A protein has these predicted regions:
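Mid-sequence, gly/pro-rich, charge-dense loop/helix-turn segments that line enzyme active sites
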Residues: 73-161
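Metabolite-binding pocket within alpha/beta catalytic cores that recognizes anionic/polar moieties
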Residues: 7-11, 15-114
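His/Asp/Glu-rich mid-to-C-terminal helical/loop segments that flank catalytic regions of hydrolases
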Residues: 194-209
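Short, conserved catalytic/metal-binding motifs centered on acidic residues
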Residues: 68, 141, 169
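Single conserved hydrophobic/aromatic residue that forms the stacking wall/gate
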Residues: 1-10, 14, 207-211
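A C-terminal functional module that forms or caps the active site or interfaces directly
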Residues: 148-186, 191
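Active-site-proximal beta-strand elements of phosphoester/diester hydrolases
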Residues: 37-42, 140-142, 187
Length: 211
């Protein structure tokens, strides 16, 4: 939503219209010369999937980009670093009693969704140009309806999914974008280490990453 944009970004945005659907406010406008729809999906995979489908159905978007924060699963990532999705997977999808590995979505050709290479490349260049001191990493995003804040769970996600960061929405957007044949990119600032200290680091970085 527009309140999450910096002052300079707001000055570069021309607001055309605003509509509320499924409890979410979709703002259409011109952002740096591009026709854009900005929206806050809410927390969790269902909210994100609903939001993405509305963007596809009602606004006919040609790409979707999700921004936010995530917990680090990669020891090379520090708080404040940026992760650009190479791919995304839902870590809480589990029908293993029926014979499929954890993370595999039954009756789907894909369970690991690949981000658009052009969007990844453009985002990496923009990130490095905006602040060369910030580490911008391309890696796997894993998502589930859980806030990861234990070393045990973190190690499980690393060993099982080889993820670089964990959050609660990105893979749902990727899943929905895949079903609609729409390119996607997830951009996440590392807010915490996804371990026993996660609940302390998250609120501070959430505020600064939105500023």
């Amino acid at each position: 939503d527009l309140h999450l944009l910096s002052r300079r970004q707001r000055q570069m945005c021309i607001r055309d219209s605003e509509v509320t659907k499924a409890g979410m406010t979709f703002v259409e406008g011109d952002f740096y010369g591009l026709k854009t729809v900005a929206v806050v999906s809410g927390i969790g995979k269902v909210n994100m999937a609903v939001c993405t489908q509305i963007l596809c159905d009602d606004f006919h978007v040609t790409m979707v980009i999700n921004t936010g924060v995530a917990g680090s699963l990669n020891n090379a990532l520090d708080i404040g670093d940026i992760v650009l999705s190479s791919c995304a997977q839902e870590h809480d999808m589990d029908v293993s009693p029926l014979g499929d590995p954890v993370g595999i979505i039954p009756r789907m050709e894909q369970s690991i969704f690949t981000a658009d290479e052009t969007l990844v490349s453009l985002a990496k260049s923009a990130c490095e140009k905006a602040n060369p001191d910030i580490h911008c990493h391309i890696g796997k995003v894993v998502s589930g309806d859980q806030f990861i804040a234990s070393a045990e769970k973190k190690n499980y996600l690393i060993e099982t999914f080889h993820g670089d960061c964990a959050e609660m929405e990105g893979a749902a957007m990727a899943h929905t974008a895949y079903l609609n044949n729409v390119p996607f990119l997830i951009i996440r600032a590392v807010s915490d280490k996804a371990d026993n200290s996660g609940h302390m680091d998250y609120p501070c970085l959430l505020y600064t990453s939105d500023a």
